[in-house]
Structures are given as C-alpha cells and as structure tokens.
Amino acid sequence: MRRLTLFVLMVFAGTAAGRAQGTSQGTSQGTSQGTSDSDVTAKIVAMEHMWSQAYVLKDPKALERILDDNFVNVESDGKLMNKADMMAEVRASTILQVLTESMVVNLHGDTAIVTGIFLMKGVERGKPFAQRERFLDTWFCKDGQWVTIAGLVTPVGE
C-alpha cells in the first residue's frame, strides 16, 4: 500500500488543541458577503481540521461534504487524485495523527487559498512512519457553501 499523503490538512487545521488557528489575509466578498473575514477563516479552518481528522477516523463521508465533485489534488509524487481517489484513500488510511503548523488563509472574494505544513504519523506495512509536507488548498464558495476545488502537497525537510 502506498504511503498516504494528505494535503489537508491535508490537511491540516491542527488536531492538537490550539493548532486549529489560521491567520487571515485578503477580503471576503461575493456570496460570502455579510460574513466577516474572521468568520470565513474560522469556517475554513474548521473544515481543514475535519478533513485531516477524516484520515485518522477513516471517515470518507467527511470528504463528501468538503471536496467539490470536480476536485483535483497533486500528490507529492506528482500523481493526480480526484474526489473518489481521496475518499478511497481515507477508507484505507493508516494515519494515526495529523498536526499542522503555519496555516494561513488568504481570502479573495469567493475563493480562499490555504497554505501550511502538516506532519502525519501512522503505520504502513507494520512499520511506523512520519511524513512532513507543505500543502496548498483552494476553496471556493459554491452556492453558499465552501468546498475545496484543488490541492497540492510537497515534501519539506525537518
């Protein structure tokens, strides 16, 4: 089984208390009109957290609500994954913990760009692993609901 990569949080709004904070830059307008930047940021951070927890809890239904039907992710090995691929990956997850750091939410009207770093730990083929990656997620407010339309993960050093 291939090493699971989470872009998240994966990921990545933080599974540890106090790590589920993101900073906000930019302005929110359009369909998110009437909602403050901090409210939008908090909502997106919460959904990022839900996304990373989906891997720990093996809960693909969480991704059903978060990922757009046309979602695309570029994995750290260059592989492209769609929504169905991501949901299958969650069902087979061996991830035990996901932590995030340096998460920033940039708001641009009905679009939000989220960047950060996540560390995931788990067991693969009976051996423990730890993986640290930078992520970039693109969120879009579609019909009044924020969904992720694209993601990218890339390895980073310790």
Where are these regions (language model features)?
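A beta-strand edge to alpha-helix "cap/lid" segment located at domain peripheries
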Residues: 21-158
